[in-house]
UniProtKB/Swiss-Prot annotation:
Species name: Mycoplasma genitalium (strain ATCC 33530 / DSM 19775 / NCTC 10195 / G37) (Mycoplasmoides genitalium)
Sequence intervals crossing the membrane: none
GO cellular component: a single term: cytosol
Entry annotated with the keyword DNA repair: no
InterPro entries: P-loop_NTPase (IPR027417), Thymidylate_kin-like_dom (IPR039430), Thymidylate_kin_CS (IPR018095), Thymidylate_kinase (IPR018094)
Residue numbers binding ATP: G11, V12, D13, G14, A15, G16, K17, T18
Family: Belongs to the thymidylate kinase family.
Record function comment: Phosphorylation of dTMP to form dTDP in both de novo and salvage pathways of dTTP synthesis.
HAMAP family noted in UniProt: Thymidylate_kinase
Protein name: Thymidylate kinase
Catalysed reaction, written as an equation: dTMP + ATP = dTDP + ADP
């Protein structure tokens, strides 16, 4: 009998996380190997968490407020979607998780990773991914993808934030040395999808996921 598995896709803005998940979803809409699939994202995944997402995307706020809202959305996400799906022995694939809070609120917004960890301590409820896949790309490639999105405000912020991009990218790359964390070159969309499928298959065929 399968154990439920929690998989997270992380990386800098423009690395291709959403495109990777959408590509995988087209190939495997409901099932992969012997697992039923649940796709989700952060912030979001539940009705309330999606409402918090809209606040985060559309309102200007203090970094600390932002961190608490991300944690609030994560609490809902874990308790109402991730944990129940894992208990049903499903494979959950999430576009971002708590590592994004460490990178963006902790480092980019400069409130500190330790502070973000404290804020998320109760939100996480010991729920961490079994496997994390880091999509990496350089600033030039990420910028081209952001330009294609057509949001001038986001693009202006992205261009001004080259140093932030480097900080966040360095943090994500530092995670690759951790257990069950894998690096995927995000420069080529087709190649990164193939690599993800290869790595995920290998991970799920391990005798144990823990």
């Amino acid at each position: 009998m399968n154990k439920g598995v929690f998989v997270v896709i992380e990386g800098v803005d423009g690395a291709g996380k959403t495109a990777l998940i959408e590509g995988f979803k087209k190939l495997y809409p409901t099932k992969f190997l012997n697992y039923q699939l649940t796709y989700t994202r952060e912030p979001g995944g539940t009705l309330l968490a999606e409402k918090i997402r809209q606040l985060l995307l559309n309102e200007t706020m203090e970094p600390l407020t932002e961190a608490y809202l991300f944690a609030a959305a994560r609490t809902e996400h874990i308790s109402k979607l991730i944990k129940p799906a894992i208990e049903k022995e499903q494979l959950v694939i999430s576009d971002r998780f708590v590592f994004s809070s460490f990178a963006y609120q902790g480092l980019s917004k400069k409130i500190g990773i330790d502070t973000v960890k404290q804020i998320n301590h109760h939100a996480l409820r010991n729920m961490m991914p079994n496997f994390t896949f880091i999509l990496d790309c350089n600033f030039k490639e990420a910028l081209q993808r952001m330009q294609k999105r057509g949001n001038d405000n986001l693009l202006d912020e992205f261009i001004k934030g080259k140093n932030d991009f480097d900080t966040v990218r360095s943090y994500y790359l530092s995670l690759v040395d951790k257990k069950n964390c894998f690096l995927i070159n995000g420069d080529n969309k087709q190649e990164h999808l193939e690599k993800f499928i290869e790595l995920l298959t290998r991970c799920l065929q391990q005798p144990t996921h823990y």
